[in-house]
Every structure is written in C-alpha cells, then in structure tokens.
Amino acid sequence: MGDPAKSSFAPSTNPSKFDSFQPDAPSRSLRVLLADDHEMVRIGLCTMLQSQQTEVCAQAKNGEEAVEKSRELSPDLIILDVSMPVLGGIEAAQQIRVFLPDVPILFYSMNNTPELIAIAKSVGAQGFVTKNQMAARLLEAVDALRDKKTFFSF
C-alpha cells in the first residue's frame, strides 16, 4: 500500500448502482385551506390540525376568500364552514369545483339535516362533521380524506 499522504482520491466516472440511491424523502404534509368566519374557531382548528402532519396553508374568513385562496394555492384539502358571510361554504365549494374538481372538501356545520348533507354531497363534499363533534372527529375526518376515503359524521 502506498503512502496515504501521496494518494489522491477522484470520484469515479463510472456509474454504480448506488448513484441513484436517495433515502426516502419525508412525506409531504397535507396542505389545508380552512374557512370559518369566527377567528377563534380558526385558531382552535389550526391548533388541532397542526398536531397532525398537516399544514394550514391559508385561512379565510368567508367563502369568497376561500375561493380566491383555493385558486391561488391549490391546497390538498379544503375545510369549509357551511354558514359564512359574503359567500357560504356550499356556494364557495360550487365555485372551487370549477378549477379544483378533485380536491377533497370537508364541510362542518351546527346543522346536520338530511337535506344539508344531501346538498353537501351534491357539490362534491367528501366529508361532513357537525360542530358539536369537531373536537372528537375532525382529525379522524382529515385522516380519512387524506386516504381518499369519505367521512360523514352527523
């Protein structure tokens, strides 16, 4: 063996099977747009969502803002309160569906009438949770939608 001080190392120009090896990249967090007209509700929901591998990429205080931010950011999941000023969640979802036809939408509301659930489904909702179940069921609903499943709890 030669003198280590005199040896040089040059990277090989021959490709090897290890050249393409890359460790598994961490899975990307779910980017969520959250719309509710009550700031305290948004703060609470953001806190809950951030405990998962979920990034709240935007918040909206009404349906009109939700439509604008959805168009701008193309989130992975949209969570909408049904009842908001300016433009409600149902109407916002109808507009969002025009340019994001496949993004999962999760609605929540104080009301859980069969008619409201049917309307939510008709505009393409993949999930619905009543507000009185949000603390217990929101993360379960988000996980279901992340896995391309539906979640209706009422």
What kind of region is each of these model predictions?
Residues 1-31, 139-147, 152-154:
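Non-catalytic signal-transmission and effector/linker regions of two-component phosphorelay proteins
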Residues 81, 109:
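Active-site residues of response regulator receiver
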Residues 39-58:
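Two-component/phosphorelay signaling modules centered on CheY-like receiver
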Residues 84:
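Receiver (REC) domain active-site loop signature in two-component systems and cognate sites
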Residues 73-79:
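Active-site beta3 strand of CheY-like receiver
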Residues 62-65, 87-91:
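Acidic catalytic/metal-coordinating carboxylates
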Residues 68, 90-101:
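Short amphipathic alpha-helix used as the core "switch/output" element in two-component signaling
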